């Protein structure tokens, strides 16, 4: 299969050195993301696109390849094509007929040709000749440039002809690794996950920082969604997941700070800690999911007070977004189900919070706070490569993996319902039940405790995370199912 990858249009207006660097980075990212599917994948760069060739033919692998490229920053869209040496107009018509001939009968169609290089003919010459001949020879109902039922598409580059089968859109932006890095403050809710996506989509490599207010279950949930976002949109780069134990910080705020100022003080403590971590990682910008006046701490006066504790640039991709738009985008990118079942602690600690806090009052409240507690939280922060979060769950719980389900055991398919429906898990003689990952922890207690349950997902990431949590909660009848 051959693909022509069209780069993000804003890349094409850069200077020659910058453009070359960005396209080389994109080619490197594509190879990294597709390496496990096809170690021999070939990616070659030209001035405004990349050409990708793979010898794999297995439909599932090709589908995976398409999905990964559709989620890669730096790509505007890509075309699946067949390549031929450029012949005369009759030869071009014949090649188009091979691919489109049967589908044109009784249809209204158009011919679209893009051309680069020096030729004795124009793109319109090709379109007129090929369109006229296909209409006569394929029994088409007619030609319409404005409202065709089928578009016969091709590209001509120098002495090469590309007949286009399909086009797949991607997410645009710049290639990860070509721009600077950021540190995203993650709570796992709608806002922070969408903010992380927006910043990664633009091309900024993003590490994840989680302030743990809610115990191990909350940490595992944020690990899960952070890993999902990275795997889907940023796996060409290795980034870190940073977990900062903030329960003691929160306790100090609850005990020492006036109730009306707790939210602002908590956010200021988070920004102080995040800035220190960013210094350690040589990162110049922080990212949050805040939007104007969505909650009391997010009014303009309060945001200004929060920002003044750091010299870092604080990026807020969602600052002017409506909540429903954020939720809709979370549904689109796949983080909504995580967010719906993620506890949100930052917004529940204040009663009658100040929407226009005064700097001198906030600083007075913080004088009551023992800063040694914040230092202790930073000392105990854990920095783990995002692709190793599963390995870092700790040795406190042994997670058993099995490659074969035995009679009497129940395999629980915890994949997203769409994935379970597209590729149902069927095992001869074994009871397979579907229970989506986002509902598993809440509903597992309803299952028969006398049975053995094997958790299954495609890559084993979510199944291990949830097995760890359930085992930690005292359920001894849980294993991970990893068929060979």
UniProtKB/Swiss-Prot annotation:
It comes from Pseudomonas fluorescens (strain SBW25). Catalyzes the ATP-dependent transfer of a sulfur to tRNA to produce 4-thiouridine in position 8 of tRNAs, which functions as a near-UV photosensor. Also catalyzes the transfer of sulfur to the sulfur carrier protein ThiS, forming ThiS-thiocarboxylate. This is a step in the synthesis of thiazole, in the thiamine biosynthesis pathway. The sulfur is donated as persulfide by IscS. It catalyses: [ThiI sulfur-carrier protein]-S-sulfanyl-L-cysteine + a uridine in tRNA + 2 reduced [2Fe-2S]-[ferredoxin] + ATP + H(+) = [ThiI sulfur-carrier protein]-L-cysteine + a 4-thiouridine in tRNA + 2 oxidized [2Fe-2S]-[ferredoxin] + AMP + diphosphate; [ThiS sulfur-carrier protein]-C-terminal Gly-Gly-AMP + S-sulfanyl-L-cysteinyl-[cysteine desulfurase] + AH2 = [ThiS sulfur-carrier protein]-C-terminal-Gly-aminoethanethioate + L-cysteinyl-[cysteine desulfurase] + A + AMP + 2 H(+). SUPFAM superfamilies: Adenine nucleotide alpha hydrolases-like (SSF52402), Rhodanese/Cell cycle control phosphatase (SSF52821), THUMP domain-like (SSF143437). This is tRNA sulfurtransferase. Pathway: Cofactor biosynthesis; thiamine diphosphate biosynthesis. Belongs to the ThiI family. InterPro entries: Rhodanese-like_dom, Rhodanese-like_dom_sf, Rossmann-like_a/b/a_fold, ThiI_AANH, ThiI_fer, ThiI_N, THII_Thiazole_biosynth_dom, THUMP_dom. The keyword Disulfide bond applies.
